[in-house]
Curated annotation (Swiss-Prot):
Organism, as annotated: Buchnera aphidicola subsp. Cinara cedri (strain Cc)
Molecular function GO terms recorded: DNA binding; RNA polymerase binding
Primary gene name: greA
Keyword DNA-binding: yes
Lineage, uppermost ranks: Bacteria, Pseudomonadati, Pseudomonadota, Gammaproteobacteria, Enterobacterales
GO biological process: DNA-templated transcription elongation; regulation of DNA-templated transcription elongation
Name under which the protein is recorded: Transcription elongation factor GreA
Keywords assigned by UniProt, alphabetized: DNA-binding, Transcription, Transcription regulation
Listed PROSITE patterns: GREAB_1
Length: 159
């Protein structure tokens, strides 16, 4: 049974772009590197050859992984979901940490799209689990290694 993988259209397109790069740029370069390394002689002690083969293995595995994810992708367009006013997958949520008054803005995305530097958090993260289904001005508690942290939901956007 194939489990669907929730992702945004942006995440789906990002994976498609990576797949295209791997297939049409990276893979041909690796094939050339293997051919060049073969010309250097004995393959048993040819570091360039073994390095290129290892890179080829990584590339082929990543291609298979991406193709599988794209096949199982369930693209969720939150602009077409009538759940306005509550936090759902794909929402961009502004929260205020009660103890510090720091403001954070997070977008809830699929596992493959999560990027903490871009404040995109996985649907399976503790923060997302605390946010899903909540409304503006709700107080949430997020379990962290140092204890619970309380936040107030200040804004919910569906971008």
């Amino acid at each position: 049974m194939f489990n669907k993988i929730p992702m945004t259209l942006r995440g789906f397109n990002k994976l498609k772009s990576e797949l295209k790069k791997l297939k049409y740029i990276t893979r041909p370069c690796i094939v050339k590197a293997i051919a060049n390394a073969r010309q250097l002689g004995d393959l048993k002690e040819n570091a360039e050859y073994h390095s290129a083969r290892e890179e080829q293995s990584f590339c082929e595995n990543r291609i298979c992984e991406i193709e599988n994810k794209l096949l199982r992708a369930q693209i969720i367009d939150i602009t077409k979901i009538p759940f306005k006013g509550i936090v759902i997958f794909g929402s961009t949520v502004t929260v205020l940490q009660i103890s510090t008054s720091n403001i954070f803005v997070y977008t809830i995305v699929g596992d493959d799209e999560a990027n903490y530097k871009e404040f995109s958090i996985s649907i399976h993260s503790p923060m997302s689990r605390a946010l899903i289904g909540k409304k503006k001005n709700d107080i949430i508690k997020v379990n962290t290694p140092t204890g619970y942290i309380k936040y107030i939901i200040k804004k919910i956007e569906y971008i």
